[in-house]
Swiss-Prot record:
HAMAP family, per the entry: UPF0260
Protein name: UPF0260 protein PA1299
Taxonomic path: Bacteria, Pseudomonadati, Pseudomonadota, Gammaproteobacteria, Pseudomonadales
Pfam families in the record: CxxCxxCC
InterPro entries in UniProt: Puta_zinc/iron-chelating_dom (IPR005358), UCP006173 (IPR008228)
Similarity comment: family membership: Belongs to the UPF0260 family.
Length: 149
């Protein structure tokens, strides 16, 4: 009987992941691509329903991932070196969970094999977002959905 091999996210640190493993941790929820607002009084960060102009509002994937920095210079590029800063990511985020030493949820595509499950379980905001091109920045506060952290 062959020994059961633990999934890579359970046996490796973020720094040990290769590029494919790193990219596969993304569950495709698109929440990191939503615009966020910071409370000037206490520094709290709030997610809005307003998505980056490059985010596909249904699939929750970037429409130009390879060149996103060219079109959105302030696009956040997650790296293993930033793991201690991942608390702003949603508590369901694969990057954050692995950084915190936790397992991936049952709906994560690496666990269940279904990349659409993140949408079926309504973890993503698929179909519930607006593009930043549709809403004036002064109105983003009207579209708050949750507090980060």
């Amino acid at each position: 009987m062959a020994a059961k091999v633990e999934p890579f996210w359970k046996r490796k640190t973020l720094a040990q992941l290769d590029q494919d493993e790193w990219e596969s941790l993304c569950d495709g929820c698109g929440l990191c691509c939503l615009q966020k607002l910071e409370d000037e009084d206490d520094g709290s960060v709030y997610y809005t329903r307003i998505a980056c102009k490059l985010l596909d509002l249904q699939s929750c994937r970037c429409t130009n991932y390879a060149e996103r920095i060219r079109f959105v210079p302030d696009c956040i590029q997650l790296t293993p070196a930033q793991a201690d800063e991942f608390q702003w990511l949603p508590p369901t985020c694969g990057y954050r969970l692995v950084a915190e030493g936790k397992d991936l949820p049952l709906w994560h595509h690496l666990v269940c094999g279904d990349p659409e499950r993140v949408h079926k379980e309504r973890i993503s905001q698929s179909g519930r977002m607006l593009s930043e091109t549709q809403v004036a920045e002064d109105d983003w506060e009207d579209y708050l959905i949750f507090r980060a952290g």
